[in-house]
Amino acid sequence: MNLIPTVIEQTNRGERAYDIYSRLLKDRIIMLGSAIDDNVANSIVSQLLFLAAEDPEKEISLYINSPGGSITAGMAIYDTMQFIKPKVSTICIGMAASMGAFLLAAGEKGKRYALPNSEVMIHQPLGGAQGQATEIEIAAKRILLLRDKLNKVLAERTGQPLEVIERDTDRDNFKSAEEALEYGLIDKILTHTEDKK
């Protein structure tokens, strides 16, 4: 069972209780703190769209601590980040792996961050298939197309040549915050909240 903390806010109109995620959303902070599936993606996309409608000029911060997950769900978040007008900064806390790393790199260039002890892991898509030979062939072709699409976006987002991305994503490739910075997955390592400004 997941308990969600409640925070009490005092205003001149009295007290108001929020669940922590609603309170963070009020400050334009979205938390991706789980594996990425369709439900998580729908929640993140809804929050992005809400904040974009509320103020199309004000930056949104997406904090990521995720082992990755579904490619199609992750691409829904990615496409929405590119689609909306507000700039989306990304901050890795803990681990951004697989699709989590992809979304970290997808933040506004110059506004992609990691905390000092966080880790980033990139790799090629994982998948499986069963059934008749033709169905397996169709699934294999699809996963290869997805791999090529993800690699092209990562090359564009990091500034690395496509061949380097293809080589480096062949297996699980873990990077410290410093290595992620050198690689171009992030733009800065944050040690204090003021560093983000």
From Swiss-Prot:
Changing I20 to C/S: Protein no longer oligomerizes, loss of protease activity. It is an enzyme of class 3 (hydrolase). Cleaves peptides in various proteins in a process that requires ATP hydrolysis. Has a limited peptidase activity in the absence of ATP-binding subunits ClpC, ClpE or ClpX. Has a chymotrypsin-like activity. Plays a major role in the degradation of misfolded proteins. ClpXP is involved in the complete degradation of the site-2 clipped anti-sigma-W factor RsiW. This results in the release of SigW and the transcriptional activation of genes under the control of the sigma-W factor. Probably the major protease that degrades proteins tagged by trans-translation. This is ATP-dependent Clp protease proteolytic subunit. Disruption phenotype: No degradation of trans-translationally tagged-peptides. Triple rqcH clpP ssrA mutants cannot be generated (ssrA, or tmRNA, encodes the SsrA tag added to nascent proteins in stalled ribosomes by trans-translation, targeting the nascent protein for degradation). It comes from Bacillus subtilis (strain 168). Changing F50S: Protein no longer oligomerizes, loss of protease activity, activated by ADEP antibiotics. PROSITE patterns: CLP_PROTEASE_HIS (PS00382), CLP_PROTEASE_SER (PS00381). It is found in: Cytoplasm. Low intrinsic peptidase activity is stimulated by ATP-binding subunits ClpC, ClpE and ClpX. Activity is disregulated by acyldepsipeptides (ADEP) antibiotics, which negate the need for ATP-binding subunits for activation and which makes it into an unregulated protease. Each ClpP subunit binds 1 ADEP molecule, which prevents binding of ClpX. ADEP binding causes conformational shifts that open the gated pore of the ring. Protease activity is inhibited by diisopropylfluoro-phosphate. Protease activity is inhibited by bortezomib, an oncology drug originally designed to work on the human proteasome.
